[in-house]
């Protein structure tokens, strides 16, 4: 039996929170020069991608404004092309895409819970 979408959405939020925690006080230069922060955030992006892949098709179809395929594709790239990871692109994802993802996932959870 497939888990409720809220389980996977909460996994996404947990990973987003960890990424925010790991990078909140970092400059881009600090991030780019520190493999520990890179590895920690890449792992959380992988989890976000895996959770996205497990969301029901009906949920993904209901929220087409989210680039679900791109999120899952980022996970695949990080898993399968780990020697070719563009750390600058990871930083851009953290600063540009993660905040937007957090906002929409919170809205989706509210919608699923029946809260306006």
UniProtKB/Swiss-Prot annotation:
PTM comment text: Modified by cognate antitoxin MA_1295; probably at least 2 successive AMPylation events occur on Tyr-82.
GO cellular component, one term: toxin-antitoxin complex
Catalytic residues (UniProt): 75, 80
Modified residues annotated as O-di-AMP-tyrosine in this record: 82
Domain of life of the native organism: Archaea
Any GO MF annotation of the entry: nucleotide binding
Subunit structure: Homodimer, probably forms a complex with cognate antitoxin MA_1295.
Family, as annotated: Belongs to the HepT RNase toxin family.
Function summary: Probable toxic component of a putative type VII toxin-antitoxin (TA) system, probably an RNase. Probably neutralized by cognate antitoxin MA_1295. Neutralization may be due to AMPylation by MA_1295.
PANTHER family assigned to the protein according to its UniProt record, in alphabetical order: RNASE MJ1380-RELATED, UPF0331 PROTEIN MJ0127
Name used for this protein in its record: Putative RNase MA_1296
Organism: Methanosarcina acetivorans (strain ATCC 35395 / DSM 2834 / JCM 12185 / C2A)
